[in-house]
Amino acid sequence: MQVLHVCSEMFPLLKTGGLADVLGALPAAQIAEGIDTRVLLPAFPDIRRGIPDAQVVSRRDTFAGRITLLFGHYNGVGIYLIDAPHLYDRPGSPYHDTNLFAYTDNVLRFALLGWVGAEMATGLDPFWRPDIVHAHDWHAGLAPAYLAARGHPAKSVFTVHNLAYQGMYYAHHMNEIDLPWSFYNMHGLEFNGQISFLKAGLYYADHITAVSPTYAREITEPEFGYGMEGLLRQRQREGRLTGILNGVDEKIWNPETDLLLASRFSRDSVEDKAENKRQLQVAMGLKVNDKVPLFAVVSRLTSQKGLDLVLEALPGLLEQGGQLALLGAGDPVLQEGFLAAAAEHPGQVGVQIGYHEAFSHRLMGGSDVILVPSRFEPCGLTQLYGLKYGTLPLVRRTGGLADTVSDTSLENLADGIATGFAFEDSNAWSLLRAIRRAFVLWSRPSLWRFVQRQAMAMDFSWHVAAQSYRDLYQRLKS
């Protein structure tokens, strides 16, 4: 079986969010399952530099100008690159300029990505063509539409990583993207009087996946559906919507082998985690004290991630003697709020604005609780890293957070399945009650260790997801 992933970023070549982490790990896991898997990416500068051995496969004149299709390898995975310097050779973000304005030609840049994905199924590479074209998020959303326009030369899967981003463009661009105008209607890619790349993926794909079972249910409801819930309910009734949890790349996130940690540890030597905590406290300007729980945040600072709730609940956390270490960037108001808290509570609150992949490992390895209070979270990887590192996740019960973290209720403790702390409502009071439960568990060290070991025993490796996708592909092919 031959599978082509169509996407806009891939860790570690280029990353702006969790999408890149998925594409950095899933293809290799599928190859290990015996699937001939390759990836198609735009040749953004960082990606092009990361695959210097890429060779020319073919050249083509397209609606978006002359392109060259290249093929190379990265970490054992075959990578196709769309080399179109007039579209992709721009520094910084792949999506917007230095003033944070979306590029005005994004409609062409990402239509081309979907177009090449579909052309691969008709022989753009004469020596390899996919049975399944697997498109990810709105950037690749037109791939299933182009496949439909070509008579479905391959089956298509469309994965929703975040339904909030919809790839909306004015209708007149239909004249520029090489799709028939008949596709521009309610039963097609039209949405609120515009072209929606996301809706194209949802409407034309043979099967839709979301990145967790709970998120797959949530997006059929108005609260999380962003206007697409009617179509998604229809796909659910047709058996064409599935939730498959993301995994953890254990080559990168594994406390037993993580060279970014001061002290490596395992489920059977969790006491060795203590040195990581000491060094993290020093690095963040916190009082060195192994007797108090250290809460951590590694996140974009946005209200979607619930970071305003953390700021509101912070006095209660500090009054109980806890510490907070935060790594992240985003909303300037939230940034200022956390910096002010650090200035007001030296030794108790440490803040680093920005994002550093290496330091995020030290934070995960050294803290006791990782806070993920998102208002919505399609899957979430942070809580999975927390489980892996014995850093108990404290999460809001939504999306993938609900699927992966079992609260320390009395029943779950008795059944030996508790792995963290979960709260229901998006408010500081609900968050504070969960924080209080964390302090209660912390006061019982043997019970804390028991929950830690249970958390570290959870298997969210990519091979589980790879098997689920393989089963889906086989159903589509049969």
Swiss-Prot record:
InterPro entries: Glyco_trans_1 (IPR001296), GS/SS (IPR011835), Starch_synth_cat_dom (IPR013534)
Superkingdom per UniProt: Bacteria
Alphabetical UniProt keywords: Glycogen biosynthesis, Glycosyltransferase, Transferase
UniProt GO molecular function: alpha-1,4-glucan glucosyltransferase (ADP-glucose donor) activity; alpha-1,4-glucan glucosyltransferase (UDP-glucose donor) activity
Catalytic activity: [(1->4)-alpha-D-glucosyl](n) + ADP-alpha-D-glucose = [(1->4)-alpha-D-glucosyl](n+1) + ADP + H(+)
Broad class of enzyme this protein falls into: transferase
Positions with a binding annotation for ADP-alpha-D-glucose: K15
A Gene Ontology term for the protein's cellular component: cytosol
Statement: the UniProt record of this protein carries the keyword Glycosyltransferase: yes
SUPFAM superfamilies in the record: UDP-Glycosyltransferase/glycogen phosphorylase
GO process terms (BP): glycogen biosynthetic process
CDD domains per record: GT5_Glycogen_synthase_DULL1-like
EC numbers on record: 2.4.1.21
Pathway the protein acts in: Glycan biosynthesis; glycogen biosynthesis
Family the entry assigns: Belongs to the glycosyltransferase 1 family. Bacterial/plant glycogen synthase subfamily.
Entry-linked PANTHER family: ALPHA AMYLASE DOMAIN-CONTAINING PROTEIN, GRANULE-BOUND STARCH SYNTHASE 1, CHLOROPLASTIC/AMYLOPLASTIC
UniProt function note: Synthesizes alpha-1,4-glucan chains using ADP-glucose.
Protein name: Glycogen synthase
Native source organism of the sequence: Enterobacter sp. (strain 638)
Native organism taxonomy: Bacteria, Pseudomonadati, Pseudomonadota, Gammaproteobacteria, Enterobacterales
Gene name in the database record: glgA
